[in-house]
Amino acid sequence: MGRGKIAIKRINNSTSRQVTFSKRRNGLLKKAKELAILCDAEVGVIIFSSTGRLYDFSSSSMKSVIERYSDAKGETSSENDPASEIQFWQKEAAILKRQLHNLQENHRQMMGEELSGLSVEALQNLENQLELSLRGVRMKKDQMLIEEIQVLNREGNLVHQENLDLHKKVNLMHQQNMELHEKVSEVEGVKIANKNSLLTNGLDMRDTSNEHVHLQLSQPQHDHETHSKAIQLNYFSFIA
């Protein structure tokens, strides 16, 4: 359900009126500060509560804002007067010169110079500003260090992963070399076995060949003896 609109009229209840004033006042001052920072505008806000309490905000100094406002209002009434225009720009130059002087003075005080004329409250405010600035510098430095550490961690993880991959490749090459060595050894063993088998078969064949030759040579001697005996038998038969 949408939020209901508040009627723009005086709030009768004093408590509700005070709460609304506090919220709206803080919101207005916050918006004025944001406008001054975002748009580089010179802003001045003056608020008086129903009890007469003063609340104000100025981007530089309230006095310079009021003076500039008065000068601008005076310019509208005499914008066609050349002398008034010259006077206006002279005042603008004086205001800018004053602002530059204030900035230079603040810078020297931030550097720890020209502190002798400051009150305890002013020194406390200066210390608070320095602490805020130092906190911002430390936060930025810590953020940059964290980012650098994250980058280094990512690079370290990549290097570690590359080392793991390289180690796996080395192990794989070693395993392949072992398998190749085993295959070469098997082939050499087969060659040696075949060679031994050939040598053994050669010796057997040579022995068999020698025996065959001996048998062939012995056959004619047997036939010669048989033939001689046959002749002798025929001879004796003839005599008888």
From Swiss-Prot:
Keyword Cell inner membrane: no
Compartment list: Nucleus
GO cellular component: nucleus
Key words of the record: Developmental protein, DNA-binding, Flowering, Nucleus, Transcription, Transcription regulation
Pfam family, one: K-box
Record keyword Nucleus present: yes
GO molecular function, a single term: protein homodimerization activity
GO biological process assignments: flower development; positive regulation of transcription by RNA polymerase II; stomatal lineage progression
Main location: nucleus
Tissues with expression: Expressed at high levels in leaves, moderate levels in roots, seedlings and stems, and at low levels in flowers, pollen and siliques. Accumulates in leaf guard cells and trichomes. Also present in epidermal cells of roots. Expressed in mature guard cells.
UniProt-listed SMART domains: MADS
Induction, as annotated: Repressed by the micro RNA miR824.
Complex formation: Homodimer. Interacts with AGL15, AGL24, AP1, AGL6, AG, AGL1, AGL11, AGL5, SEP3, SEP1, AGL63, AGL14, SOC1 and AGL21. Interacts with AGL63. Interacts with SVP.
Record function comment: Probable transcription factor involved in the regulation of flowering time in long-day photoperiod. Participates in the repression of FT expression and floral transition, by interacting closely with the FLC-SVP pathways. Functions in the satellite meristemoid lineage of stomatal development.
Protein name: Agamous-like MADS-box protein AGL16
Species for this entry: Arabidopsis thaliana (Mouse-ear cress)
